[in-house]
């Protein structure tokens, strides 16, 4: 573009770095599930997090790859269009993500188990990522407790809130898996990838926690539209 290779542009470099970090986080989370299963420990919650995160992050990576290819992304010979199509179904197969998030969120609310912290027992290059992880962990614990007190058993009817809590936990879990993997390998590459992955995941998780405060209003506004939406559908014969 403009006589320069795409990789020379900082915007492209940032996108590719984030894609690589997402792949690292996906691999880390799947490895974590496998290791726990090998120890014959329960993988129910962790496997849910891996399924949701990996199916959504992989599709996002493929979508960005199509964008970077430009019009060539739609040409079958490049292979990325097929990756995008095939990647989309994974959010539905083996349990739709929306349903899994409800189950996972309700599990978090009933478990009352504090989220583990990483502290400072990590490589110096991961201190920032570990601090971001621990801030999110404490924020999630506080938000879960506030939700329990505010809604009690009625929280099962607050699906938007429950899903946002679960998404914050998925981000936290993927960030922790990334940091722990990099701490074990201690290679410069893994440390750099884990830092990008964990910082981004924790920022996303914090946004989901912020969104929980707006969940009731979002649900109310959506409910107000239902009459028009379904009336329009009936008029159209649907």
Predicted ranges, named:
Residues 1-238:
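Alpha-helical interface subdomain recognition
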């Amino acid at each position: 573009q403009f006589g320069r290779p795409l990789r020379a542009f900082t915007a492209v470099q940032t996108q590719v770095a984030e894609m690589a970090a997402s792949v690292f986080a996906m691999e880390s989370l799947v490895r974590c599930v496998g290791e726990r299963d090998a120890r014959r420990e329960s993988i129910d919650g962790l496997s849910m997090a891996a399924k949701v995160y990996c199916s959504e992050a992989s599709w996002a990576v493929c979508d960005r790859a199509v964008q970077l290819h430009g019009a060539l992304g739609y040409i079958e010979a490049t292979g990325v269009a097929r990756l995008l199509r095939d990647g989309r179904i994974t959010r539905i197969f083996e349990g739709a993500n929306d349903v899994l998030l409800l189950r996972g969120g309700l599990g978090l609310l009933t478990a009352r188990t504090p989220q583990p912290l990483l502290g400072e027992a990590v490589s110096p290059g991961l201190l920032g990522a570990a601090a971001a992880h621990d801030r999110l962990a404490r924020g999630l614990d506080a938000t879960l407790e506030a939700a329990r007190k505010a809604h009690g058993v009625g929280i099962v009817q607050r699906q938007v809130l429950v899903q946002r809590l679960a998404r914050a936990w998925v981000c936290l879990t993927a960030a922790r898996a990334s940091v722990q993997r990099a701490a074990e390998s201690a290679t410069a590459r893994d440390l750099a990838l884990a830092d990008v992955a964990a910082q981004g995941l924790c920022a996303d998780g914090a946004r989901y926690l912020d969104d929980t405060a707006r969940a009731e209003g979002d649900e109310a506004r959506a409910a107000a539209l239902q009459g028009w939406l379904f009336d329009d559908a009936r008029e159209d014969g649907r």
